[in-house]
């Protein structure tokens, strides 16, 4: 990992990961300048990374942000291992792979990151939040989303990864089955008054935390807000109040 990038990171206790759903680096960096790295992390997905590349990730990290590189690597073991190493070299905080790539692929990814003193969290994707039982059936999987999530998440844990991406509806089940140290990253987070958009299995921030989620990926409620930092702070305040009641 680039030591200059690592030194520039601002550690945050907020579980919020803001999804940078922008088409290019200019838009993403302009938006990031309106946020505080002490109050959130950022997610860079396939569209943005494909258009802007490693330089964007390094620029965000140099500004103090911890970056989740959401590329969902899914290929032969050696290719995924090398991709994960490249992600670590760019200074990311978290990177993910598809659990459906299987044991050898996930173990190769884990081993590729083992030598880094500041190793990124390695997370696996189970079932995409846009998918329902009918979608799984069309690709030959005779299981409910919950059943398939548990199967893939168990395999992920057995391969030594840090956690999974899952919907909040599966969080309680996974915490019970796989333990509290197994991290759950939850997309599909919406505020109570937000439209569901294209993610079917959605939940509010505090409900997701109550269910067992560790990190909350939030996009439109923050990126489309007139004042993104104010929206982020309102969410963090709600989370702080909720967590205070739990302690």
Curated annotation (Swiss-Prot):
Disulfide bonds: none annotated. It catalyses: orotidine 5'-phosphate + H(+) = UMP + CO2. GO terms for biological process: 'de novo' pyrimidine nucleobase biosynthetic process; 'de novo' UMP biosynthetic process. It is an enzyme of class 4 (lyase). One of its GO terms (molecular function) is orotidine-5'-phosphate decarboxylase activity. SMART domains: OMPdecase (SM00934). Pathway: Pyrimidine metabolism; UMP biosynthesis via de novo pathway; UMP from orotate: step 2/2. Keywords: Decarboxylase, Lyase, Pyrimidine biosynthesis. SUPFAM superfamilies: Ribulose-phoshate binding barrel (SSF51366). InterPro entries: Aldolase_TIM (IPR013785), OMPdecase (IPR014732), OMPdecase_AS (IPR018089), OMPdecase_bac (IPR047596), OMPdeCOase_dom (IPR001754), RibuloseP-bd_barrel (IPR011060). Belongs to the OMP decarboxylase family. Type 1 subfamily. Homodimer. Catalyzes the decarboxylation of orotidine 5'-monophosphate (OMP) to uridine 5'-monophosphate (UMP). This is Orotidine 5'-phosphate decarboxylase. It comes from Chromobacterium violaceum (strain ATCC 12472 / DSM 30191 / JCM 1249 / CCUG 213 / NBRC 12614 / NCIMB 9131 / NCTC 9757 / MK).
């Amino acid at each position: 990992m680039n030591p200059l990038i690592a030194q520039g990171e601002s550690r945050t206790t907020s579980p919020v990961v803001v999804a940078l759903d922008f088409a290019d680096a200019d838009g993403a960096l302009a938006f990031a300048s309106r946020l505080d790295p002490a109050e959130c992390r950022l997610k860079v997905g396939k569209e943005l990374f494909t258009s802007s590349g490693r330089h964007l990730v390094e620029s965000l990290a140099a500004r103090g942000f911890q970056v989740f590189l959401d590329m969902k690597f899914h290929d032969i073991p050696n290719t995924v291992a090398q991709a994960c190493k490249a992600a670590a070299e760019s200074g990311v905080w978290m990177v993910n792979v598809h659990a459906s790539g299987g044991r050898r692929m996930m173990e190769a990814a884990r081993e590729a990151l083992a030598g880094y003193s500041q190793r990124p969290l390695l997370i696996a994707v189970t079932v995409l939040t846009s998918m329902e039982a009918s979608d799984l059936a069309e690709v030959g999987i005779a299981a409910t989303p919950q059943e398939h999530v548990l199967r893939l998440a168990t395999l992920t844990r057995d391969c030594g990864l840090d956690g999974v991406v899952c919907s909040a509806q599966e969080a309680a089940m996974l915490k019970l089955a796989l333990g509290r140290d197994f991290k759950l990253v939850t997309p599909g987070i919406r505020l109570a008054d937000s439209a569901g958009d294209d993610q079917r299995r959605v939940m509010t921030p505090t409900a997701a935390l109550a269910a067992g989620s560790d990190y909350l990926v939030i996009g439109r409620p923050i990126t489309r807000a007139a004042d993104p930092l104010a929206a982020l702070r309102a969410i963090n305040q709600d989370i702080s109040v909720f967590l205070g009641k739990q302690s």
